[in-house]
Amino acid sequence: MKSQDIRKQFLEFFKSKSHTIVPSAPMVLKDDPTLMFTNAGMVQFKEFFLGNSVAKSNRVTDTQKCLRVSGKHNDLEEVGHDTYHHTMFEMLGNWSFGDYFKEEAISWAWELLTEVYKISPENLYVSVFEGSDDRDDLGLDTEALELWKKIVPEERIIYGNKKDNFWEMGDQGPCGPCSEIHIDIRSEEEKAKTPGRDLVNMDHPQVVEIWNLVFMQYNRKANGDLEELPAKHIDTGMGFERLCMVLQNTQSNYDTDVFTPLVGEIEEITGVTYGKSEENNIAMRVIADHVRAVAFSIADGQLPSNTGAGYVIRRILRRAIRYGFTFLNTKEPFIYKLVPVLSGQMGATFQELKSQQNLIENVIREEEASFLRTLDQGLILLENLMKESKDKTISGEKAFELYDTFGFPIDLTALILKENGYDLDEKGFEAELKKQKDRSREATAVSAGDWIELNPVDEESFVGYDKLEADAKIARYRKVESKKKGEMFQVVLNKTPFYPEGGGQVGDKGILMSSDGEVVDVVDTKKENNQIIHFTKNLPKNTEAEFKAIVNKTERYNTASNHTATHLLHQALRSILGTHVEQKGSMVQSGYLRFDFSHFSKVTGEELEKVENFVNARIREQLSLDEQRNISYQEAIDQGAIALFGEKYGDSVRAIRFGDSMELCGGIHVKNTSDIWHFKISGESAVASGIRRIEAITGEAAMKYFEEQTNILEEIKSGLKNSNDPVKAINNLQEENINLKRQIESLLKDKAKNLKSKLKHEVKSINGVNFLSKKVDLDAAGIKDLAFQLGEEIDDLFILFGAEQHGKALLSCYISKELVKGKDLNAGQIVRELGKYIQGGGGGQPFFATAGGKNPDGLNEALQKAESFIK
């Protein structure tokens, strides 16, 4: 059975059980402070489990793309080394929100596996929660046990502990016991030796969990206590790749048609055959898995970067590159070539892979090229560390510096050291890594208290599109603490005009004012699990009072101006550069706007001018806002609205139109484009391969910019001889400056020529080396030029020049190439050693290197010590 058919049968089965099929949510999460990636099928339904929203359908099913690489669900290090862990995977699931419970969940799971997929019951085992004797004091899940007894023999029921059979969303929130279904796909001979039940949850590659049925019936409070949920829910998840392994009768997920096209392409590109060597097998599995994770992340809008979710994606891709580099001998970018195979294989189910294919290929290719350069640099640095080591051991601190500063993988460091007979201080490295993780954890740790319910509401009313003020009451609040922001309060109102951060737009600020005049500042607004959360530094004295919720008008108007400008900018770019342009990210706040978009070359000055003129023309046209709320998604698309990639849209959406610009958008906008006043581009740059960024200002910021430019112009004119024609006056100054530079260069050349003749007579021979150590009055470029000229005329030459420039010290070392080879001299090592005398450091090539320092008084001692390197 093909994987596409397996997926389809699952969804159709639950559709026949009155479930609504819903699309996968994005794998990359944008508005969830607790998660960077969707790591389970239930993530997109958290708001229903938490009771913050009411589901439109109380029975749903889907296939959800997931990523597990960090935190509690961290499968990264296992990936490739076994045959059933993955970073990116599909989770097939069915959910009940307060509708059916254990009986239906269990019976339907068994029906699908044994009657639809025709899996032999003889190969299946099930587990139930055995209870716990800790502070929760939970008993055996007798309800699930009795239900399973009606279906399977008792010897196939396993009693599981809290670790395996009690599922929790996190430190707080809905949770409950679960039943896992495991399958034994070993040979009959192996089954006869060891019963399958003895291998359940023992990390056996052929006795694996395929389905987890979670019975959400409790809520974990901030103090650790459990309480019964008012409504009970079902949350199930089945690993699609593992199911394919079972139904396609293979011994590995990587032998299914989910992975074989990718593995085959890797074989074709590298010339290495899968199955001949375990090292090669692991490398191929790592690459086949990781390209999926990276491609889906980029398709969902997350580019590789040095922070947050982007860093996780970069780390996954670099792990794949490193395995190819080390075990498949790939020294050129090649992983990007797998993207068309992946797109052809999964693009029908996940359309974003097809629509974003060019971008994915370009980003991966550029990342590969960049990291391969890093690997080359790291190899040189590691080689130098080995040469400097006297006891054939590289310290954990140095290895961590290679890893942290230069991005050089620690396991590659360990492998190279081992091959060269060196040891790595692994404990020292782990200690440094732990310090870094502790610092990061401490900086980002947030502790949250329980919600205090005052005036419970099913769903908060947002009135911010029409009003900047609203009468409100506090529905609930809780205290949160973090090292970065200290103690704060999260407040949920029954009605609010405050727009929460989302869609690239920052959250509103403002105040809550009680009837007796007390004012509480709202410093930020965010959305979490479908709740609009207002962040305050303190609570009002009377939390039961009625309040005026008032948004900061100035910040709101400026932000709205910038947001509308991004829509006009998007239209301008598509009109001038081409319809290939797609928005890839944005930041809209009161002071400026930032807009990222797909385009594969630098935007020229002429093109930027056209873009700016296009937007300002729309501003002068005084286009009115045409807003459609609660329009169906399909109707909006049919009208020509642009939907942004990586965004999750519901059945009904909000469409924003200004003239011919129409986009799906939940943000705040001006009523008329004339309110923007003016649009001015302040910068254009590259974000990643195929992604450009434009920064711009509007309104008050643009007005202030023009005032500053006018003042600068007046200041320039006042300092010129011809203030009536400043351009001509500046051209004259530039021409005069060029002539003076030429004269100075000519004088310096004469000086260096005379100095070279003089220095040739000061060279002395020591142990077969022509040696010169001298303080000179030249800049860095002049010193380098002089050293190489002397090197061309004198063989076996060792030079150390010192110079003082602008109160700083400079050392430059030149060594003839024959000395580098014959005497094992290294200019880079020498300047690093001598740099301590000038309170500085440096490096470079073995034949030429420089060091800078803040202590010119140490130059003479450094110059004197140079001779010791050849004695």
Swiss-Prot record:
Reaction(s) catalysed by this chain's protein: tRNA(Ala) + L-alanine + ATP = L-alanyl-tRNA(Ala) + AMP + diphosphate
Cofactor: Zn(2+)
Keyword tRNA processing: no
Enzyme class of the recorded protein, top EC level: ligase
Domain of life of the source: Bacteria
A Pfam family assignment: tRNA_SAD
Binding site for Zn(2+): 563, 567, 665, 669
EC number: 6.1.1.7
Gene3D superfamilies per record: 2.40.30.130, 3.10.310.40, 3.30.54.20, Bira Bifunctional Protein, Domain 2, Threonyl-trna Synthetase, Chain A, domain 2
One MF term in the entry's GO annotations: alanine-tRNA ligase activity
Xref: SMART domains: tRNA_SAD
InterPro entries linked: aa-tRNA-synth_II/BPL/LPL, Ala-tRNA-lgiase_IIc, Ala-tRNA-ligase_IIc_anticod-bd, Ala-tRNA-synth_IIc_core, Ala-tRNA-synth_IIc_N, Ala-tRNA_ligase, Ala_tRNA_ligase_euk/bac, DHHA1_dom
UniProt cofactor note: Binds 1 zinc ion per subunit.
Main location, first listed in the record: cytoplasm
Any one GO CC term of the record: cytoplasm
Keywords recorded for this protein, A-Z: Aminoacyl-tRNA synthetase, ATP-binding, Cytoplasm, Ligase, Metal-binding, Nucleotide-binding, Protein biosynthesis, RNA-binding, tRNA-binding, Zinc
Subcellular location: Cytoplasm
Record has 4Fe-4S as a keyword: no
Domain notes per entry: Consists of three domains; the N-terminal catalytic domain, the editing domain and the C-terminal C-Ala domain. The editing domain removes incorrectly charged amino acids, while the C-Ala domain, along with tRNA(Ala), serves as a bridge to cooperatively bring together the editing and aminoacylation centers thus stimulating deacylation of misacylated tRNAs.
Role of this protein: Catalyzes the attachment of alanine to tRNA(Ala) in a two-step reaction: alanine is first activated by ATP to form Ala-AMP and then transferred to the acceptor end of tRNA(Ala). Also edits incorrectly charged Ser-tRNA(Ala) and Gly-tRNA(Ala) via its editing domain.
Stored NCBIfam families: alaS
Family: Belongs to the class-II aminoacyl-tRNA synthetase family.
Name of the protein: Alanine--tRNA ligase
Species, as recorded: Christiangramia forsetii (strain DSM 17595 / CGMCC 1.15422 / KT0803)
Annotated gene: alaS
